[in-house]
Structures are given as structure tokens and as C-alpha cells.
């Protein structure tokens, strides 16, 4: 029989996975604790007991996923073009390796594109964004004259939105060619 701490950990993992799916599918505002609880097969009170509130759960997931994604790219040292290609390939590999990776990507895109993300979460994400390998990649590419001019934050959002759509097409087998080089052209100065 599992110990109390093992049962709690298993319950927390079920809540966490269910919350990622619900937030990714419905967005922050349209997701309720009841939605998450139903998906996890538990009561809403257990979510509050283990995570505090919907906002705290969303905040934890947001920061965890953002940190995981940034860690995938923390070791990139090539020029901006090769880094872009590597980012696309690594994300695609993660999707192929992990059955639920697309759910995490759905959540992340919902997080960065939603107008309803709580302010404190946005503030923490903005702090993380300042250390983002993609932002640094864009800024370095602009300084070298290789990347189009514009606000790095807006280009960062364009990067992730385009990448998400490209990977979705690959994931759903609707893209007949490797996206790596095509994707880099989105940011390239012509």
C-alpha cells in the first residue's frame, strides 16, 4: 500500500496534468477548478488544499513549463541561424519523444497569447522573458543585422506563434517538408 506522501504526490501529478490540459484547451478564464477536478477524478477542494487556488496552480504550471522550455535552449552557442534551426529541431524531438508534449505546448501558447493571464503571472513571465534564449537570439541577430528590426518581445511572440503552428502541422502530418529552414526565414532580414 502506497504511503501517504506517495498518494499525495500521485494526486498532485494527476491534478497538474489535468490542469495543463484544461488551461491549454480552455484558457485561464474559462477553466474552472471543477473542470480540472473532473478531469483529474477528484474534488475541487483537493485542488485548493494541495495548490491553494486556480491562480496559484496556473502560476506554478506557467513558470514550470516556461523554465523547461528555456532549459532546452540554454546551451545554444551557434550563430542565430543555427540556433533557430536547433530550437525547431529540439521542440520537434520533444514532441516525438513525449506523448503529452503537445499538451504542454498548447498550454504555453495559451499562456503567452491570452489576454486573461493574471498580472502577477505575467510579471514573473516577463522577468523570465528577459533571460529568454529566444529573446537573446533575436536581439543578437538584430545587432548582427541578420534579423528584422522590431521590438524583440513582439518578435519573440511571433517566433513562438509561428513555431507552434509549424510544429502542429508536423505533429498532425500536414506538412510534407522539414520546417527548420523555412521557419528561420520568418525572422531573417531580406
Where is each model-derived feature located?
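Short, basic, alpha-helical segments at the C-terminal edge of helix-turn-helix-like DNA-binding modules
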Residues: 63-69
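N-terminal intrinsically disordered/low-complexity leader segments
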Residues: 1-10
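Amphipathic alpha-helical packing segments from all-alpha helical-bundle domains
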Residues: 70, 117-144, 153, 157
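Amphipathic alpha-helical segments used for helix-helix packing
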Residues: 96-117
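Helix-turn-helix
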Residues: 10, 14, 18, 22-56, ...
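C-terminal peripheral helix-coil segments that are non-catalytic and often amphipathic
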Residues: 2, 85-93, 131-143, 160-190
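Hydrophobic alpha-helical connector segments
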Residues: 60, 74-101, 154-159
Amino acid at each position: 500500500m502506497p504511503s501517504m506522501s506517495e498518494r499525495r504526490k500521485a494526486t498532485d501529478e494527476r491534478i497538474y496534468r489535468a490542469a495543463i490540459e484544461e488551461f491549454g484547451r480552455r484558457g485561464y478564464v474559462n477553466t474552472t477548478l471543477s473542470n480540472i477536478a473532473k478531469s483529474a477524478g477528484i474534488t475541487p477542494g483537493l485542488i485548493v488544499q494541495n495548490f491553494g487556488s486556480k491562480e496559484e496552480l496556473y502560476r506554478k504550471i506557467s513558470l514550470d513549463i516556461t523554465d523547461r522550455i528555456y532549459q532546452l535552449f540554454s546551451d545554444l552557442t551557434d550563430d542565430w541561424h543555427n540556433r533557430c534551426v536547433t530550437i525547431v529541431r529540439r521542440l520537434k524531438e520533444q514532441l516525438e519523444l513525449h506523448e503529452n508534449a503537445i499538451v504542454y505546448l498548447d498550454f504555453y501558447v495559451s499562456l503567452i497569447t491570452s489576454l486573461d493571464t493574471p498580472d502577477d503571472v505575467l510579471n514573473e513571465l516577463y522577468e523570465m522573458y528577459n533571460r529568454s534564449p529566444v529573446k537573446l537570439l533575436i536581439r543578437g541577430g538584430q545587432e548582427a543585422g541578420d534579423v528584422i528590426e522590431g521590438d524583440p518581445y513582439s518578435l519573440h511572440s511571433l517566433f513562438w506563434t509561428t513555431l507552434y503552428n509549424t510544429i502542429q502541422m508536423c505533429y498532425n502530418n500536414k506538412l510534407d517538408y522539414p520546417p527548420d529552414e523555412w521557419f528561420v526565414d520568418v525572422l531573417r532580414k531580406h
